[in-house]
Amino acid sequence: KGNIWSGGYYNLKCFDLETNEVRLYPGVSSVTSIVEHDKDHMWIGTASGLYLLDRNSGKYQYAGSELEGVYINSLYQANDGLLYIGTNGAGVIVYKRQNESFENYYTDNSALVSNRIFTILPEVDGRIMMSTENGITCFFVKEKHFHNWTRGEGLLPAYFNASSGTLRMNKSFVFGSTDGAIEVPENVKFPSYKFSRMIFSDFHVS
């Protein structure tokens, strides 16, 4: 609708550019991320979980006990309706509202390089790029696995900012950091991993 949404520590606001009016949506605090769900609803990420806002009535619905107390840094809703949630310590959570299901990726159950996800950018060619505490990670949607680009693979040292990034018209990815913007070209090649079966010829526990 061409509105501008603004969050913060104390309240949520919507600026209507056609009427120059501002509407307050009291009820949540410490808003960290705002994403449109559909024409009537907005996803609101906060320092204590996820909410679904009815923009007409102003009512909030808490989204799932699995996210209770989770600090959310970034939100991205894909074209298929899946909501990708970047958290500050709990990895990446994929939420499917139709059946209220959650899929959680973190360092112990995937190749994700860090559990602190700062920014999630829109999907391009089946890949979703994210900035993390330890570098940039690329999630392959179909295969459901991560490839990482860290200082060990040549990434310049950077401390990324939460919810700071954009997808350019040329499909390159831009992430904001404390040292400026870092642009990643669309055709960047991430290090690939090779896995093989290990065979032990001896095993000793002391």
Question: Where would I find each of the regions flagged by the language model?
Answer:
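Carboxylate-rich, polar loop motifs that coordinate divalent cations or form catalytic acidic clusters
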Residues: 1-206
